[in-house]
Amino acid sequence: MKKQFAVMFCLLAIFTCLVGCSGKTESLFPSAFVRAVGQEKADALKTLGTTEQALSDYTVDVYGKTADVQLSFDAYRGDETSAGKLNYAELTVPCTPNGDGFSYMRTCYNKLEKALGEPFTTDVNMDGVSAEDDTDTLFAALQKDAGGENICALQYQWRGLGENESLLYLYYYPNEDGSARVKLTFLPKERAQIP
């Protein structure tokens, strides 16, 4: 009887540990990061497949060299020392269609831009679009590069970063109820398999 009780107690302890530990698997933002970008922006950014230390290293490298601290395009791009330390990040914002497809996408883009911190079209290079082009040109390229009925994706590629060259993807997902969301995804070179 005592043996059975001991076995049951051990099983209960294991179960309790599993339940108690399961909520700790999601990576938390370092307090320095939250203070730097604000709680609202920190809540908007969801990190997947990264560790707290990696995110901390990344933000220290980026924000330590940025006078105007904000969650912006430059923060995703990083630089030669910080790019690639963040394994994966995405930001999703809701948006509602208005008029034609271009206006629809533009609305989503504006919301994403606002969530990240404006502007975020500098230092961007992609096929046929230079860093000097305005957001309308970039947005037209996004619409032209539609990858399918339900996804419109634009690939940003930063050059001149050597082994830390990275990619940024902007995805547009329409929902059945007429709303939509836009997702921004950063991938370092080793994850994106850049040739």
For each feature predicted by the language model, list its residue ranges.
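Short, recurring structural edge motifs at helix starts
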Residues: 27-34, 96-99
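Positively charged n-region of N-terminal signal peptides that target proteins for export
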Residues: 1-7, 11
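An acidic-aromatic pocket/loop used at catalytic or ligand-binding sites
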Residues: 94, 133-195
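A glycine-biased structural micro-motif
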Residues: 35-39
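Bacterial signal peptide processing site
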Residues: 22-24
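Long, charged/polar, surface-exposed segments that mediate recognition or autoinhibition
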Residues: 67-154
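C-terminal motif of bacterial Sec signal peptides marking the signal peptidase cleavage site
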Residues: 17-20
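Post-signal-peptide N-terminal segment of Sec-exported extracytoplasmic proteins
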Residues: 40-66
